[in-house]
Structure formats: C-alpha cells, structure tokens
Design a protein with these regions (language model features):
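Conserved SGNH/GDSL esterase-like catalytic core that processes O-acyl groups on lipids
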Residues: 1-34, 51-62
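Extracellular/periplasmic catalytic domains that process cell-envelope and extracellular macromolecules
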Residues: 10-12, 39, 69-70
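Functionally constrained cores in energy, signaling, and assembly domains
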Residues: 14-16, 41-45, 83, 97, ...
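Structural recognition of the beta-strand scaffold that forms the well-ordered cores
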Residues: 15-21, 43-48, 75-78
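Catalytic His-Asp segment of secreted/periplasmic serine-dependent ester chemistry enzymes
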Residues: 55-116
C-alpha cells in the first residue's frame, strides 16, 4: 500500500496496475479495499496464486475472486487455474516457478493485459 501511495504522490502510478501476491502470504478484504481506494479507477490486473504448501492459498484466491466481482476495474489473471497440473512449472518446493514456469507466468500476464 505504501508503495502505491508513493507512486501516486509522485505521479508515477500508471493507468494499468499489475498486482500479484505471489507466494508471500495473506491479504485481507480491508487491506484490499484500502489498496483499491488509492488505485482509484485505474485498470487493475490481479494475479491469483498457487502455493499448495500453504493453507492460505484457497482463502487468498477466494478473496481475489470476490474482489474481482466487487470492483469493475479488476481483471483477474488466473495463475492458479493455468498452472494446474503443471508440476514442471515449479521448482522442487512446489512454490517458486521454474524457468519454464516463469515463461508461462509472463505469457499469461501478457495475454491478459495485451489481448483482453
């Protein structure tokens, strides 16, 4: 949130905002609402997560689904679905993307942002 506020203050927050939690933990609806207040009417591309080793994975993805419904300016990029059944896209820890996974992740983002 602080980074978004700083970018906005400096006039550097662009019309398209890419948000990805990655594999780093929980977010709450209140935190997300605060973030969306700062972002305003900009187009937001929200990437959900695949972290099968963490119990919060499904909770976060459910929150992201809810937020994509709540806010018209959010496009959900479904990394969870795209990476399903693709163990070679991840390192041995089943969390961090492999080289192939990084290619697929980047391609998924590009397709959603550039070819809506």
């Amino acid at each position: 949130l602080e980074e978004i506020k700083q970018l906005k203050k400096e006039g550097l927050l662009k019309k398209n905002v890419l948000l990805g939690l990655g594999s780093n933990g929980l977010a709450t609806e209140a935190q997300f609402d605060d973030l969306m207040t700062e972002i305003g009417d900009r187009q937001v591309y929200l990437i959900n997560t695949r972290v099968p080793t963490q119990r919060w994975q499904n909770e976060v993805n459910a929150l992201f689904d809810q937020m994509a419904t709540k806010y018209e300016n959010i496009t959900l990029i479904n990394w969870y679905q795209a990476s399903d059944g693709q163990p070679d896209w991840f390192r041995e820890d089943q969390v961090h993307p492999s080289e192939q996974g990084l290619i697929e992740y980047t391609g998924l983002i590009a397709r959603n942002v550039l070819l809506p």
